[in-house]
Design a protein with these regions (language model features):
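Short acidic DE-rich linear segments
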Residues: 129-133
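Structural detector for short beta-strands of small beta-barrel domains
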Residues: 2-12, 69
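Acidic, low-complexity, intrinsically disordered interaction modules
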Residues: 15, 19-120
Length: 133
């Protein structure tokens, strides 16, 4: 993974980690990493409606929600200088889109996100923080 590379990231239900899929370069369309954490800039939140409806219909989760952006190995400090961090969540049984966890307002894009794995009661779950410049 290189700095500024376009990727899409999703929560891997089997590995309990983030899967990172390349959106450009020789590995375009392939998972290039599994990670406990990643930072992205120029971020868009995407939910594929057909996948979401399939989850609701069948009661089984599938990969259909992504955080897309550019890898920020360096330069992420710009986002953190004057940031207002907001926790972002998505639950296909409740929401149609990613939402601000506090206000429940839909969110479709942001300047930067920091994604990491949290441990609570012995269970791993994803945490996504949104940062606006």
């Amino acid at each position: 993974m290189t700095d500024n590379m376009r990727v899409e990231v999703y929560w891997n239900l089997h590995k309990h980690l983030f899967s990172v899929r390349a959106l450009e370069g020789p590995n375009k369309g392939r998972v290039i990493s599994h990670s406990h954490g990643i930072s992205l800039t120029d971020v868009k939140f995407a939910v594929q409606p057909a996948g979401r409806e399939r989850v609701r219909r069948e009661g089984k989760k599938n990969v259909h929600a992504f955080v897309r952006g550019r890898i920020a190995n360096s330069g992420f400090e710009d986002c953190r200088e004057n940031f207002s961090d907001e926790k972002i969540t998505y639950n296909p049984y409740i929401y149609d889109t990613f939402v601000n966890a506090k206000t429940k307002e839909p969110i479709f894009k942001t300047d930067c996100v920091e994604m990491d794995v949290m441990l609570e009661d012995g269970k791993r779950y994803p945490r996504i923080l949104s940062f606006e410049k």
